[in-house]
UniProtKB/Swiss-Prot annotation:
Family: Belongs to the NusG family.
Coiled-coil portions: none
Annotated protein name in UniProt: Transcription termination/antitermination protein NusG
One of the GO BP terms on file: regulation of DNA-templated transcription elongation
The keyword Transcription regulation appears for this protein: yes
Function: Participates in transcription elongation, termination and antitermination. In the absence of Rho, increases the rate of transcription elongation by the RNA polymerase (RNAP), probably by partially suppressing pausing. In the presence of Rho, modulates most Rho-dependent termination events by interacting with the RNAP to render the complex more susceptible to the termination activity of Rho. May be required to overcome a kinetic limitation of Rho to function at certain terminators. Also involved in ribosomal RNA transcriptional antitermination.
Occurrences of domain KOW (ranges): 130-161
GO cellular component, one term: cytosol
Highest classification ranks of the organism: Bacteria, Pseudomonadati, Pseudomonadota, Gammaproteobacteria, Enterobacterales
Domain of life from the UniProt record: Bacteria
Keywords: Transcription, Transcription antitermination, Transcription regulation, Transcription termination
Gene from which this protein is expressed: nusG
CDD domains: KOW_NusG, NGN_Bact_1
Gene3D superfamilies xref list: 2.30.30.30, NusG, N-terminal domain
PROSITE patterns membership: NUSG
Length: 181
C-alpha cells in the first residue's frame, strides 16, 4: 500500500481584485470534478484594518498578498489543469509554467503565524511611526506640519510636535486629523 503524496502549498496568480472569486471558483471546481483528495485549503490571507473616512470608523479587509491565492494541493497533471482552467487564474508563481514550485514550509509557517497574530484587534489602515513628518488637516492646528513623537494604536491617537511661532509644541491628535506629509 503506497502512501498518498503530500499536499504542498502553491501560489496562484489571479486577476487583482478577484482573489476571493478565484478561491470560491477553485473550491467549486474541485468539488465538481471530485478531486477533493488532491486539494487541501484554498485561501486568500487577509487582515482586518480600520480606516477613518468622513469622521466615521470603518472596518475593511486588506489582503496580505494582493493578486495571489494560496492553494494546498498535490501537484500532478490533473490538478495543474484544474487550477489553470479556473476563470481569472493567470498561472502559478515559482518554478516553470508547466512545473510550478511549491513554497517552502518556512514561508508557510511565516504566513500562518502572521494570520494568527492578526487576531481580534483590527489595525489602522495608515500606520504612523515616531519621527515621521505629518500634516495636520483638521482642528485648530490645520495646515501645520509636525513630527510624530508617540503613537497610541489603542486610542487611535498621536502625539505630534507642531512648530508654532518657531517653537515645537506637543499636540495630541486623532489619526483622522493628520495625514502623511
Amino acid at each position: 500500500m503506497s502512501e498518498a503524496p503530500k499536499k504542498r502549498w502553491y501560489v496562484v496568480q489571479a486577476f487583482s481584485g478577484f482573489e476571493g472569486r478565484v478561491a470560491t471558483s477553485l473550491r467549486e471546481h474541485i468539488k465538481l470534478h471530485n478531486m477533493e483528495e488532491l486539494f487541501g485549503e484554498v485561501m486568500v490571507p487577509t487582515e482586518e484594518v480600520v480606516e477613518i473616512r468622513g469622521g466615521q470608523r470603518r472596518k475593511s479587509e486588506r489582503k496580505f498578498f494582493p493578486g495571489y491565492v494560496l492553494v494546498q494541493m498535490v501537484m500532478n497533471d490533473a490538478s495543474w489543469h484544474l487550477v489553470r482552467s479556473v476563470p481569472r487564474v493567470m498561472g502559478f508563481i515559482g518554478g516553470t509554467s508547466d512545473r510550478p514550485a511549491p513554497i517552502s514550509d518556512k514561508e508557510v509557517d511565516a504566513i500562518m503565524n502572521r494570520l494568527q497574530q492578526v487576531g481580534d484587534k483590527p489595525r489602522p489602515k495608515t500606520l504612523f511611526e515616531p519621527g515621521e513628518m505629518v500634516r495636520v488637516n483638521d482642528g485648530p492646528f490645520a495646515d501645520f506640519n509636525g513630527v510624530v513623537e508617540e503613537v497610541d494604536y489603542e486610542k487611535s491617537r498621536l502625539k505630534v510636535s507642531v512648530s508654532i511661532f518657531g517653537r515645537a509644541t506637543p499636540v495630541e491628535l486623532d489619526f483622522s486629523q493628520v495625514e502623511k506629509a
